[in-house]
Amino acid sequence: MRIMGLDVGSKTVGVAISDPLGWTAQGVETIQIDENRKQFGYDRVKELVLEYEVEKVVVGLPKNMNNTIGPRAESSKIYAEVLESRIGLPVVLWDERLTTSAAERTLIEADVSRKKRKEVIDKLAAVMILQSYLDTTN
């Protein structure tokens, strides 16, 4: 069963997909979105769901360090609800505290240029979110 992981930001959505056995996560792409224009990438996510025969989606929930839900987490919850209604598959919210920071550190340690980091950070964060989910549920 393939599972999709999403890191939803204000400008991009990082996408990762599990292997068919649900053990490992691989980055797929970064979808550009525009909250001001109400363009959220739902259609592209649905295309990827069909292409990879995804059965479940995990959306990162960026809780505050004190476990409260802030504005960014509220946006992620709404995104997950709308996505679930559009694709007709279960969508799970998963605590993603510090994944973007961890992704940035990983890329810096790998000596990836700032420009390239900007291009791949959300995809790597999606991989980390999905891998955390897979490690916990398998």
UniProtKB/Swiss-Prot annotation:
<dbReference type="GO" id="GO:0004518">
    <property type="term" value="F:nuclease activity"/>
</dbReference>
<keyword id="KW-0540">Nuclease</keyword>
<comment type="function">
    <text>Could be a nuclease involved in processing of the 5'-end of pre-16S rRNA.</text>
</comment>
<keyword id="KW-0963">Cytoplasm</keyword>
<dbReference type="Pfam" id="PF03652">
    <property type="entry name" value="RuvX"/>
</dbReference>
<dbReference type="InterPro" id="IPR037027">
    <property type="entry name" value="YqgF/RNaseH-like_dom_sf"/>
</dbReference>
<dbReference type="InterPro" id="IPR006641">
    <property type="entry name" value="YqgF/RNaseH-like_dom"/>
</dbReference>
<comment type="similarity">
    <text>Belongs to the YqgF nuclease family.</text>
</comment>
<keyword id="KW-0690">Ribosome biogenesis</keyword>
<dbReference type="GO" id="GO:0000967">
    <property type="term" value="P:rRNA 5'-end processing"/>
</dbReference>
<dbReference type="GO" id="GO:0005829">
    <property type="term" value="C:cytosol"/>
</dbReference>
<dbReference type="InterPro" id="IPR005227">
    <property type="entry name" value="YqgF"/>
</dbReference>
<protein>
    <recommendedName>
        <fullName>Putative pre-16S rRNA nuclease</fullName>
        <ecNumber>3.1.-.-</ecNumber>
    </recommendedName>
</protein>
<dbReference type="InterPro" id="IPR012337">
    <property type="entry name" value="RNaseH-like_sf"/>
</dbReference>
<keyword id="KW-0378">Hydrolase</keyword>
